[in-house]
Amino acid sequence: MAKATGRYNLISPKKDLEKGVVLSDLCNFLVSQTIQGWKVYWAGIEFDVTHKGMALLHRLKTNDFAPAWSMTRNLFPHLFQNPNSTIESPLWALRVILAAGIQDQLIDQSLIEPLAGALGLISDWLLTTNTNHFNMRTQRVKEQLSLKMLSLIRSNILKFINKLDALHVVNYNGLLSSIEIGTQNHTIIITRTNMGFLVELQEPDKSAMNRKKPGPAKFSLLHESTLKAFTQGSSTRMQSLILEFNSSLAI
């Protein structure tokens, strides 16, 4: 009697389903409060977001800082000395990083429509709103987004997180310390610091860096611990300490 088999399948349907991300996972940014901050669930990934470093960010912005921290303030004058810059929450920083990861994927890969358009919309939603749900109205997108495609998006976000982890602490021997991604309406800059990632969102022309007439900018800090669970970095605690002392950064 003939028997159906999946003998030559590389991934069994069961495993694919287990690892799969459904469209609703990409369109929901679920947040719950914890003692130290928040738990966030997005694209099948759970993030622990903490308040750590935020008090220091506010002190640098309001001139309430120790003289030893002046280098940090002078390194980012367009953030800390700009009357048109505003500090956002770490949840905002995570949203911007995830949006940047999607944009990075759109730049790196020739994704077919409607997938590219759908990802662009999800990226804009993360970047420009603080809502927890995005309503993907296009039925065609829902039909064509297979589990494999969604899982690919998730794995590429994790690859982007590892790209961030590979950055060096800013001001350390001139080594690469930032990732910059330009979209039609924004410039995203993510910089590695001692405490984690300084995330900034500027106008496309980066007018915030104009010293005479600085344009608007938003910024925040996402603590190192939030992304550490997803990285494959091999840096030891001792290497981290050396970087910390050599960089002389407050944040």
UniProtKB/Swiss-Prot annotation:
Membrane topology of this protein: Peripheral membrane protein
Gene behind this protein: VP24
Cellular component terms per the entry's GO annotation: host cell endomembrane system; host cell plasma membrane; membrane; virion membrane
InterPro entries the record matches: Filo_VP24
Family stated for the protein in its record: Belongs to the filoviridae membrane-associated protein VP24 family.
Gene Ontology molecular function terms on file: structural molecule activity
Keyword annotations of the record: Host cell membrane, Host membrane, Host-virus interaction, Inhibition of host innate immune response by virus, Interferon antiviral system evasion, Membrane, Viral immunoevasion, Virion
GO biological process: symbiont-mediated suppression of host innate immune response; viral process
Primary location recorded for the protein, binned into one broad class: virion
Protein name, UniProt field: Membrane-associated protein VP24
Assembly mode: Interacts with host importins KPNA1, KPNA5 and KPNA6. Interacts with host STAT1. Interacts with host KEAP1; this interaction activates host transcription factor NRF2 by blocking its interaction with KEAP1.
Localization per Swiss-Prot or TrEMBL: Virion membrane; Host cell membrane; Host endomembrane system
Domain of life according to the entry: Viruses
Biological role: Prevents the establishment of cellular antiviral state by blocking the interferon-alpha/beta (IFN-alpha/beta) and IFN-gamma signaling pathways. Blocks the IFN-induced nuclear accumulation of host phosphorylated STAT1 by interacting with the STAT1-binding region of host importins. Alternatively also interacts directly with host STAT1 and may additionally inhibit its non-phosphorylated form. Plays a role in assembly of viral nucleocapsid and virion budding. May act as a minor matrix protein that plays a role in assembly of viral nucleocapsid and virion budding.
